[in-house]
Design a protein with these regions (language model features):
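Long amphipathic alpha-helical segments
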Residues: 1-76
Length: 76
């Protein structure tokens, strides 16, 4: 996995919205495949889901993660 891919995963999973959106935009602008970016988002969402199940995240974090995914999806 490339460094920027891991950074995107971490930004989404850690609720760093501005960073996640900027990384996704940069990856797309650099020619990364939109489906790859969305696949990374899906992987990050799995982490968010696990953190929710473990009680680390609550409903507001799920909503924020969904909003990030939607905004990145609109870019792709």
């Amino acid at each position: 996995m490339k460094e920027n891919e891991q950074r995107l995963l971490d930004a989404i999973a850690d609720m760093r919205e501005d960073e996640a959106l900027a990384l996704a935009r940069a990856m797309l602008d650099a020619g990364d495949a939109p489906l790859r970016v969305l696949e990374l988002c899906r992987t990050a969402m799995e982490t968010v889901g696990k953190r929710f199940q473990e009680g680390e995240y609550f409903l507001p974090e799920l909503i924020l993660a969904g909003e990030m995914l939607e905004r990145i999806g609109d870019m792709a």
